[in-house]
Design a protein with these regions (language model features):
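N-terminal, positively charged/glycine-rich alpha-helical extensions of SAM-dependent methyltransferases
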Residues: 2-42
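Conserved SAM-binding loop and adjacent beta-strand
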Residues: 43-58
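Conserved class I S-adenosyl-L-methionine
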Residues: 69-78
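Class I SAM-dependent methyltransferase SAM/SAH-binding core
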Residues: 79-123
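A short acidic, Gly/Pro-enriched loop at the edge of an enzyme's catalytic core
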Residues: 126-134
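A short SAM/SAH-binding and catalytic strip from SAM-dependent methyltransferases
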Residues: 133-146
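A short glycine-rich, Lys/Arg-flanked "PGG" loop and its adjoining helix->strand segment in the class I
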Residues: 149-159
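Conserved beta-strand signature within the Rossmann-like core of class I S-adenosyl-L-methionine
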Residues: 160-168
């Protein structure tokens, strides 16, 4: 697949392979085996660094202001970086799901009464629990039909709950945001950039009243 110069520029300043992956179409998402291999090494270790702090801070800020101390479902939690950012603010319950068993193995020691991690395919995951906050942190663009995924997860959202979506800025993200518009209304949105001028849009969303 040929990437346009503008998309290449978006990848500058951060690990190249890690930045190019989300720019591909969802159907080119690596299979489970590749994700397991990557989590077995240090491929995603940069996510815990300063270059990623801006969008994590916005996500945590929305949580702390809109649903402080609530229950959280983190879809595509990886190695639990977001959980470590949320924990100092407190939560009633946190569940992180990821289909890479290698990622979940790395956070086994963090499980406690309020914190759990589960190996699960987000497209088939189900629960009888309702969450105050559902977070898609750099995970939504990996799905073939992001809007269908969000619509499904709205069924797991508490009545006054909030969906928080963070996506690195790229041309093909516009279509995803537009596809979400009939399902959710924007409570607030923030765009942030790091020193390498890589940017993220983070939105706090609520289910539309008519749904």
């Amino acid at each position: 697949m040929k990437l346009s110069p503008s998309l290449i520029m978006l990848a500058q300043g951060l690990p190249l392979a890690a930045r190019l992956l989300p720019l591909f179409a969802a159907e080119e998402t690596p299979p489970r085996a590749r994700w397991e291999h990557e989590y077995g090494g240090d491929r995603w270790s940069y996510l815990a660094g300063l270059d990623e702090a801006a969008h994590y801070s916005v996500i945590v800020g929305y949580y702390a202001l809109l649903q402080p101390g609530g229950s959280v479902l983190d879809v595509g939690c990886g190695e639990g970086i977001l959980q470590s950012r949320l924990a100092p603010h407190g939560y009633r319950r946190y569940l992180g799901i990821d289909f890479a068993a290698g990622a979940i193995e790395r956070v086994e020691a963090r499980r406690d009464r309020a914190t759990d991690f589960q190996v699960a395919d987000a497209t088939s995951f189900t629960t009888d629990q309702a969450f105050d906050v559902i977070i898609f942190n750099e995970s939504l663009y990996y799905f073939c039909d992001p809007a269908a995924v969000v619509e499904r997860y709205l069924g797991f959202l508490a009545g006054d709950g909030v969906v928080i979506v963070s996506m690195v800025i790229a041309r093909n993200r516009i279509a995803i945001w537009n596809a979400l518009a009939p399902l959710v209304e924007t409570v607030d949105e923030t765009t942030v950039f790091n020193r390498a001028r890589v940017g993220w849009t983070v939105k706090a969303l609520r289910r539309r009243a008519e749904l």
